[in-house]
Each structure stands twice: as C-alpha cells, then as structure tokens.
Amino acid sequence: MESNPVYEHLGIEPLINAFGTMTHIGGSLMAPEVTAAMAEASRSFVPLRQLQERVGERLAELTGAEAAFISAGAASGVMLAGAACLTGTDAEAVARLPDVGTRPSEFVISLVDDHTYIHQSLRLIGGTLAEVGTTDTVSVDNYAAAINAYTAALVVFLGEQSRTQLGEVIELAHAHDLPVIVDAAAQLPPRANLVEIPAMGADLVVFSGGKAIAGPQSTGLVLGRRELVEACVLNSSPNFGAGRGMKVGKEEMVGLLRAVELMLADDEEARVRDWEEQCRQMMRAVGDAPGVTVDFNPPYSASFPAAAPFLRLCFGVNAPLPA
C-alpha cells in the first residue's frame, strides 16, 4: 500500500479497506476529476445561493427529479427533509423551528431503522416520533395505524425496508395527503435508484454523496418534489434556518456534481463484475484454509448496497491467522 505523507505527518497509518463505503473509515475515495473540480472551485469567490441553485438544477436534470439539493451528508439531508415537512416554504415557520406551534409535527418511522441519530435529528428540529413495528419487521398496517391529525410525514429506511414496501407506504401516505421521506443513503449502486426511487413518488429521497457516488464524504444528495426541496434550501445554509450550521461549501457542491456526472457515465456493469471477480479471487485464495469459513453474496443479493457483492470470512480457533 502506498504511503500518504499527509497522514504520516500525523502519525496515522492508512487502512486497506475491505469493508465498503463506511463513514468511520472515510467513506470512499474521490476520483482525480472530482478533487480537481474542487480545487478549481476553491480559487474563486462565488454567490453561494446562485451556485446552490444552479448545481441543484443540473443535478435534477441528470436524475430526472423535480428538484435537487446538496446537504452536509445524508443524515443532514434527512434532518432538513424533516424540517421541510414541518415548515414548507413558510419563512416564519422556518424562523421558529424547533418551535412548531400548532403545525403537524409527528414523523411515523419504523423501528427497523437502528440509526438512532436519524431519530434524534427529527427530534432536534421540533418533531416527535411515532415509532412503529419492531426492530425486526414493520408492515404498512403499522404505518397506517399511526397516522393521525398531527402526522407531518412518513419515513422509510430503504434497504431494511423493501422497495415493494416503499411503494405501499407512498400509496398510503399520498392517500392521506402526507409526504414520504426516504433514507436511501447506502442504496447505490445500482445508480438507477437515483432515478427510479424519486420516480416512484417518494417526496424526498436522500442519498449519501460520500459513499458509492464517491463525492466529498461531507455531502448528501436530496432529490424530490420542488416545493419540498425549496423548503430544504430555506432551512439550510447560507439561509438562516435550523440547518445553518450544516454548511456545504462551494468546493463540496462542485465536487458532488462532478462525482454524479462521473457515476452516470461509468460502466456500472463492468465495475460490478470487477468487484465480483475480486471476491472470487479471495475465495480461491483462502477458501480451503483450515478454520476459515467463506460466505459469498453475489451482486444484487444484499441490501447495502444492492448491487455490491460481499464476501465474509469467519476465522475459527484453528485458522492459520487470527481474525
């Protein structure tokens, strides 16, 4: 593995990543084209609201969504999506958060989503939670039973919850004139999800910018209904809403846009085949080793992300090397 002088100077040894696009090890690695675009963006001042608007328009063009917005990570995107459902584009309501007054402020969210920070983030903006189902399963009937006059939105964690169930939740929510927020942070690849999930009718869909998109790790991509995306913008920086502290710089905006452009132009099938071959090479190398158990999940058989193959190695006490 090549040394990295930036980390050497700090006394930190880089890792060999055999885990995936995990936040705690840095997400993904950006392509040279992305870092070059970010460096170029850093050389000029620019009207940030204008850049935010134009980048959003371009991302919407690329994905076919009504509108798009770059957040400071996917968790920030879910929080701002929640704020958008609480305030709409009402400037006074934006200024009052987390005081929601008499507005509907309850989010119906499943307990199968064990990302507690998502639950916390919706409370931070003044929301309350109707947590439904169990840590193992949730049904559309669970969602339906929780809807009341105080409901602001329904939240779906795609991956733990299936696309089929998402469609059912969307149908249920829209029958009650309620929006649906989809946490799809790790649901790329396939890149078709960028287009297909919003096209299902999900009102706000949030992807990580620093996982499979391979943009800046501190970015998220919010796609959805124009009015609600505009409400996300009002609640975020450089405006004076509850999300002011979740700043996205000009460099990150330009970097994520370039990363999305590269992702959409990439030969995804070839990339997935390459990943699968890497897994099979490892299987051939260690599969017969004593004490080593191999569990291979081919592409499109898992949930995080759906298209990625996974190889799990379990080391027993008689394995030649410790785990």
Which residues does each predicted region cover?
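Broad hydrophobic/π-residue packing in well-ordered secondary structure
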Residues: 45, 118, 321-323
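Residue-level signal for secondary-structure boundary elements
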Residues: 46-50, 93, 155, 240, ...
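Conserved PLP-dependent catalytic core of the aminotransferase class-I/II
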Residues: 62, 264-299
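Charged, low-complexity, helix-prone segments enriched in Lys/Glu/Asp/Gln
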Residues: 41-42, 49-50, 86, 96, ...
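Conserved C-terminal alpha-helix-loop-beta "cap" of PLP-dependent enzymes
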Residues: 6, 287-323
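Conserved PLP-enzyme active-site core in the AAT-like
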Residues: 2-25, 29, 56-70, 75-264, ...
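A glycine-/small-polar-enriched, mobile loop at the entrance of the PLP active site in fold-type I
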Residues: 16-54
